[in-house]
Swiss-Prot record:
Keyword Coiled coil belongs to the record: no
Gene name for this UniProt entry: pyrR
Cited PANTHER family: BIFUNCTIONAL PROTEIN PYRR
Record-given protein name: Bifunctional protein PyrR
Organism: Latilactobacillus sakei subsp. sakei (strain 23K) (Lactobacillus sakei subsp. sakei)
Enzyme class: transferase
Gene3D superfamilies documented for this protein: 3.40.50.2020
Keywords: Glycosyltransferase, RNA-binding, Transcription, Transcription regulation, Transcription termination, Transferase
Similarity annotation: Belongs to the purine/pyrimidine phosphoribosyltransferase family. PyrR subfamily.
EC assignment: 2.4.2.9
Biological process (GO), any one: DNA-templated transcription termination
Intervals of motif PRPP-binding: 99-111
Annotated catalysed reactions: UMP + diphosphate = 5-phospho-alpha-D-ribose 1-diphosphate + uracil
Amino acid sequence: MVKEVVDSTTMKRVFTRITYEIIEQNKGISDLVFVGIKTRGVFIAERIAKRLEQLEGVTVPVGTLDITLYRDDQHDLNSHNEPQLNGNDIPVDITDKHVILIDDVLYTGRTIRAALDALMDLGRPKKISLAVLVDRGHRELPIRPDFVGKNIPTALNEQIKVAMQEIDEHDGITIEKLN
């Protein structure tokens, strides 16, 4: 059973709310860098950056982080049974910058732990904050987001799916019951 919990109109409001929270909690945004975790985190980062530019007239660099080699629970393997790497693309040096790490759903915290390891291999940021579109709870690691679009409590036998226009041809968030 699939249940829509956020439609496209509400999703736009969520992006605006996260953007305002980022503006309010940062004295200046000149040292900000948004880093999206592949795949949907990148699209979310780009949308927040676009909204920030509309509201404040400031362009924030947006980077892409591939955490494949840093995961402790899974790897995408290619035909040679090796991890499938897609590469990082961060347009600026993150050293001494305030990096806002962005992902779609925060669940156990393992993805974020892997992303923190990957980021630290790329430089030494002044500060790292975490923004997520959805916090569904059930943490296994002591990780807490700084910016949350929606808190959507779930059961362990449920899954949150985020649809993004860029790859899914529509926006929305659904909860699906697993078998």
